[in-house]
Amino acid sequence: MEFGFFKGLPHTGSNENFSDYKKFNNSISKENVISHIRSLEAGLTSEPSIELFTGEKIRAGIYDDGDFVFPYEFLHYYANYDIGIPYEYENYLKSIGVGQEKKGTEN
């Protein structure tokens, strides 16, 4: 599943509305999601992307996480703006333990 390809990004098929991502109300904390995404290996391009709201140049590329593909730039927007992640991706993250507190363990 692809997500986060907002209109204005330099990727083929970038046709999603940024504002749609404001509707996601996720139960996993942003800190946990950001930490997980930062742990992924990114495929970066040499061409920059232009930040949709400030016009500054930012890195461009792609993240591939299981069955999910999203632009490298998504992390910038997720970390800096009030948006969420699709519920399908959130469910996947939960299934691999992201944001799931470990209950007391036996020694």
Where do the language-model regions lie?
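Alpha-helical interaction/linker modules in multidomain eukaryotic proteins
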Residues: 1-107
